[in-house]
Regions:
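Flexible, glycine/proline-enriched loop segments at strand-loop-helix junctions
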Residues: 7-10, 52-61, 109-113
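Single conserved hydrophobic/aromatic residue that forms the stacking wall/gate
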Residues: 1-9, 13
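Rossmann-fold dehydrogenase core element
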Residues: 42-61, 78-85
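Alpha-helical support elements that line or immediately flank enzyme active sites
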Residues: 14, 20-23, 30, 60, ...
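Short acidic, glycine/serine/threonine-rich loops at helix termini
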Residues: 38-42, 68, 94-100, 232
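Rossmann-fold NAD(P)-binding glycine/threonine-rich loop
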Residues: 14-54
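NAD(P)-dependent Rossmann-like dehydrogenase/reductase catalytic/cofactor-binding core
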Residues: 200-256
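C-terminal substrate-binding/catalytic lobe of Rossmann-fold NAD(P)-dependent oxidoreductases
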Residues: 78-217
């Protein structure tokens, strides 16, 4: 029988394989991949990479922003289910003025509207964190700002946690764990989106906005969807290319 999804996966692999046949040893996609292609979020599941992986996905900017935080919460508190809402700067997939678009609402003028649309980031989460498969829903609101986006994570946990305890855990993880180079943390009561232009982190937790009510928590995570994501892609590229630059002084041992 005809399987359109299988055909789509085959086309995706075939199209990217043309780079390999032209002499490239590896291909890294800067978008979520379907099928059997690995979706890698550097710093979280890059240890799953194998030498035999020729085509690799660096996932999306939003996936890179939410996966490190979701992994932290899942490992330490457990996640029963949740919803991810991303308030995302508009992109070149949208129209500058009202026009036709296969995505209906995305056809409306991007600089003039907030646009409710879909996000593929949540589906990509389960490729990086398999235990969260079918536990999360997601949506996106495209807004008329040029850069820096915000992910809102509403999660139901397996055990209760107080707000101060949760923020302290997130702060410690951001400053003294293996995630310290990809997770940022701010407690500024005046923080707004432009404060995070050119942030090198994949995500920055806004502790002032944290909500904890028993087993339900809400986290607000800023991310520069251009620069922060590019940093993640570069780190993944260096790993794939086996580029290991020495750092001084020697990095501290990971505590988390």
């Amino acid at each position: 029988p005809h399987d359109p999804l299988r055909r789509q996966r085959q086309m995706c692999i075939r199209d990217r394989s043309q780079h390999l046949s032209s002499g490239a040893s590896k291909v890294i996609l800067t978008a979520p991949a379907k099928g059997d292609i690995r979706n890698i979020v550097f710093g979280v599941n890059d240890s799953a990479l194998k030498e035999s992986d020729k085509i690799i996905s660096a996932a999306s900017c939003t996936t890179n922003a939410i996966v490190p935080v979701l992994k932290l919460i899942s490992d330490n508190y457990g996640i029963s289910n949740g919803h991810i809402e991303t308030v995302h700067s508009y992109t070149n997939d949208q129209n500058l003025i009202d026009n036709f678009h296969k995505g209906d609402r995305r056809g409306r003028s991007a600089p003039l509207n907030m646009v409710i649309t879909t996000t593929g980031a949540v589906k990509a989460v389960s490729k990086a964190i398999p235990e969260l498969k079918d536990k999360l829903t997601g949506n996106a609101i495209r807004v008329p700002t040029p850069n820096v986006s915000l992910a809102v994570l509403v999660l139901n946990l397996d055990r209760s946690v107080e707000r101060d305890e949760l923020n302290e855990f997130l702060k410690t993880s951001a400053f003294a764990s293996k995630y310290r180079e990809i997770i940022g943390y701010t407690n500024s009561p005046e923080a707004v989106s432009t404060d995070f232009y050119s942030s090198p982190y994949a995500t920055i937790i806004d502790s002032q906005a944290t909500i904890a009510d028993g087993k339900q928590i809400t986290l607000y995570c800023w991310y520069d969807n251009e620069y922060g994501y590019t940093k993640q892609v570069l780190n993944l590229t260096k790993k794939v290319a086996s580029i290991d630059l020495q750092r001084f002084p020697k990095a501290i041992e990971d505590s988390v």
